[in-house]
Amino acid sequence: MKLLEEFIQEKGTVLPGNVLKVDAFLNHQIDPVLMQAMGNEFAKRFQDLGITKIVTIESSGIAPAVFAGLALSVPVVFARKKKSVTLTDNLFTSTVYSYTKKESNDISVSKQFLTADDTILVIDDFLANGQAALGLLEIAEHAGAKVAGIGIVIEKSFQQGRELLNKTGIPVYSLARIASLENEEILFLEEE
């Protein structure tokens, strides 16, 4: 998606350890025009798959997921990283490792919001090692829900995440695919 690639080039910063900082439009401040365009692109790609819900992880996956949900007219469910007094039992849970935070988190979704009747689209902000998406797939499996597709905002194609997700047989679509972050230069793969 050219618009997203332009935002990444103009406003993204490469940090040590192959970390891409996109706080200016996705991970801290949100650009709603870009989010709407991304949501529409995800909807266009997955519109014929019978999606009944979109599932993501708090917090940076929420904005693109909501705009995709709006475009597809379906609810969005986000996995919580921390339990609260209102989210304590009747949960589907998985443990995921965060590449950027270098820590594991238990993520949870209430059984009330995900069932075997659902056909879901997983949306995540980044694909690096694939652990977040795999955790959401595990939650869907616990619920008996069908995962029809995985939408990724930014994929670091030089890491193993895509390879792991491809092994699931579920269609994966990334809006921007990064080939390299070497020498603080952002190089993209061609669009899918």
Curated annotation (Swiss-Prot):
<feature type="binding site">
    <location>
        <begin position="128"/>
        <end position="132"/>
    </location>
    <ligand>
        <name>5-phospho-alpha-D-ribose 1-diphosphate</name>
    </ligand>
</feature>
<protein>
    <recommendedName>
        <fullName>Xanthine phosphoribosyltransferase</fullName>
        <ecNumber>2.4.2.22</ecNumber>
    </recommendedName>
</protein>
<dbReference type="InterPro" id="IPR029057">
    <property type="entry name" value="PRTase-like"/>
</dbReference>
<feature type="binding site">
    <location>
        <position position="156"/>
    </location>
    <ligand>
        <name>xanthine</name>
    </ligand>
</feature>
<keyword id="KW-0660">Purine salvage</keyword>
<dbReference type="InterPro" id="IPR050118">
    <property type="entry name" value="Pur/Pyrimidine_PRTase"/>
</dbReference>
<dbReference type="Pfam" id="PF00156">
    <property type="entry name" value="Pribosyltran"/>
</dbReference>
<dbReference type="InterPro" id="IPR010079">
    <property type="entry name" value="Xanthine_PRibTrfase"/>
</dbReference>
<dbReference type="InterPro" id="IPR000836">
    <property type="entry name" value="PRibTrfase_dom"/>
</dbReference>
<dbReference type="GO" id="GO:0005737">
    <property type="term" value="C:cytoplasm"/>
</dbReference>
<keyword id="KW-0963">Cytoplasm</keyword>
<comment type="subunit">
    <text>Homodimer.</text>
</comment>
<comment type="function">
    <text>Converts the preformed base xanthine, a product of nucleic acid breakdown, to xanthosine 5'-monophosphate (XMP), so it can be reused for RNA or DNA synthesis.</text>
</comment>
<comment type="pathway">
    <text>Purine metabolism; XMP biosynthesis via salvage pathway; XMP from xanthine: step 1/1.</text>
</comment>
<keyword id="KW-0808">Transferase</keyword>
<feature type="binding site">
    <location>
        <position position="27"/>
    </location>
    <ligand>
        <name>xanthine</name>
    </ligand>
</feature>
<dbReference type="GO" id="GO:0000310">
    <property type="term" value="F:xanthine phosphoribosyltransferase activity"/>
</dbReference>
<dbReference type="GO" id="GO:0046110">
    <property type="term" value="P:xanthine metabolic process"/>
</dbReference>
<dbReference type="GO" id="GO:0032265">
    <property type="term" value="P:XMP salvage"/>
</dbReference>
<keyword id="KW-0328">Glycosyltransferase</keyword>
<dbReference type="GO" id="GO:0006166">
    <property type="term" value="P:purine ribonucleoside salvage"/>
</dbReference>
<feature type="binding site">
    <location>
        <position position="20"/>
    </location>
    <ligand>
        <name>xanthine</name>
    </ligand>
</feature>
<comment type="similarity">
    <text>Belongs to the purine/pyrimidine phosphoribosyltransferase family. Xpt subfamily.</text>
</comment>
